[in-house]
Amino acid sequence: MIRGMKDSTMPIIASLRGKAAKVVADIVASTSFPSIMKIIEPQSYLDFGYITANACGIITDSGNVAEEATFNQVPCITLNSYTEHIETVKVGTNVLVGEDPDSLSIALEDMVNGTWKKAGIPDRWDGRSAERILQILSC
């Protein structure tokens, strides 16, 4: 998958820990991959929320991160062939690329060039859940 990111001109922040961080760092060090990748420790909820809301795009294997990306209208590439949050693909900003480096490279090009798919916010993702819950409870 790192091969699929090798031509990126955007800085890449990888929130990894332990063995995953070491494996990725070793792979990056053993290739001609530009030094645009920065590996950081996993962040607090608020810090991670800030990073994801202000990112040019997100690459993840997490359905929950894809949800955050859709809510913030940030392009998201999921390194999987399925998601438990299909609305992020059908309505939102998420695209599934599986484990194919070429598909990742094409999606990254769209992300960086600003040609990402048009997306919306899925039904009931309007931030008004508390109001709806109170309305149901008061009946």
Predicted segments, located by residue:
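Nucleotide-activated sugar donor-binding and catalytic core shared by glycosyltransferases
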Residues: 1-139
